[in-house]
UniProtKB/Swiss-Prot annotation:
Family: Belongs to the complex I LYR family. LYRM9 subfamily.
Superkingdom in the source lineage: Eukaryota
Organism whose genome encodes this protein: Physcomitrium patens (Spreading-leaved earth moss)
InterPro entries: Complex1_LYR_dom (IPR008011), Complex1_LYR_LYRM9 (IPR045291)
Record-annotated disulphide pairs: none
Protein name from the UniProt record: LYR motif-containing protein PHYPADRAFT_186863
Length: 66
């Protein structure tokens, strides 16, 4: 797994902690499962696309629960 992907995973877990307690477990597991799925990605363009989707989805979830 590339360093960029590991860093993105850490950032997502930090954001998960900002969610209401009942939903934290679900989104932490969701993030873990998706990052494991993409752990073999090596192509820089694919990694950029993945990180952009992660950012977009994370922002959407945070707006949804506020």
């Amino acid at each position: 797994m590339s360093q960029a992907v590991k860093q993105a995973y850490r950032e997502v877990l930090k954001l998960v902690k900002r969610l209401p307690p009942p939903s934290r477990g679900y989104y932490a597991q969701y993030a873990r499962e998706n990052f494991v799925t993409y752990s073999e990605v090596e192509d820089p363009e694919s990694i950029r696309s993945l990180l952009a989707r992660v950012h977009h989805h994370t922002c959407w979830v945070l707006k949804k629960v506020r």
